[in-house]
Design a protein with these regions (language model features):
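Membrane-interface helix termini and inter-helical loops of multi-pass transporters
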Residues: 31-40, 94-101
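Conserved small/polar residues in nucleotide/adenosyl-binding loops
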Residues: 181-188
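Short amphipathic alpha-helical coupling elements at transmembrane boundaries
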Residues: 38-45, 134-142
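Mid-bilayer segments of alpha-helical transmembrane spans in multi-pass integral membrane proteins
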Residues: 83, 87-91, 106-126, 147-148
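Juxtamembrane/interfacial segments flanking transmembrane helices
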Residues: 31-36, 125-136
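Structural signature of hydrophobic alpha-helical transmembrane segments
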Residues: 46-56, 108-110
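Alpha-helical transmembrane segments of multipass membrane proteins
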Residues: 20, 42, 63-65, 87, ...
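C-terminal ends of transmembrane helices
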Residues: 62-73, 126, 138
Length: 192
């Protein structure tokens, strides 16, 4: 029984860590991320659509596509990761909390990179994902010889270039904890 519950609790905990870093470090300092999270941040900064809601809206069509390609069994942990992340984001969006890092974007990007990297690593090591670009990378990996880690790096790079074009702020894109933590989490999982 404990073996079945432990991965579930672990994925939920990882989602909480990731959502905490995103809500309290990335968003207040207008930093960005790659992948689907980057798209949710674009919509938040431009249109004030809550990150928690946009995370779900982006993932619904991706899950439908992945369901058709991979079948239902392989998606349960990803559904749990995505749903948990959206719930934690919604919870943290309602809890006002500030950390005085005196606007030091280097420290902010390091702290957010560590939190997001740990959160993703915990989720991945428990067999889950946060959906989004992870699903896109898995689908592309199925039909190419490119590793999931390299595909994620390419997707993240593309989103960051889109962010640079839209917001024209190289400084914020540079301070973004680029996909390095994401890439390292996949190396830990053994997908490179």
């Amino acid at each position: 029984m404990l073996r079945k519950i432990q991965p579930i609790i672990t994925i939920i905990l990882g989602a909480a860590i990731y959502a905490f870093g995103l809500t309290y470090f990335v968003v207040p300092h207008h930093l960005f991320e790659g992948g689907a999270t980057g798209v949710t941040l674009i919509t938040y900064y431009l249109f004030k659509i809550p990150v928690s809601l946009m995370n779900l809206l982006i993932n619904i069509p991706l899950f439908i596509l992945a369901w058709k390609i991979f079948g239902p069994k392989t998606l349960y942990s990803s559904l749990l990761g995505t749903f948990s992340l959206s719930v934690w984001l919604a919870v943290f969006e309602r809890i006002p909390l500030q950390f005085d890092l005196q606007g030091d974007l280097i420290i902010v990007s390091l702290v957010s990179g560590v939190l997001l990297g740990i959160g993703l690593g915990v989720i991945f090591n428990a067999g889950g994902t946060t959906g989004g670009s992870d699903i896109v990378a898995r689908i592309l990996n199925k039909y190419t010889n490119i590793s999931i880690g390299k595909l994620l790096f390419g997707i993240d790079f593309f989103i960051l270039m889109l962010i640079l074009i839209l917001f024209q702020d190289l400084r914020l894109v540079t301070y973004t904890p680029v996909s390095y933590t994401h890439l390292r989490a996949h190396e830990t999982r053994g997908n490179l």
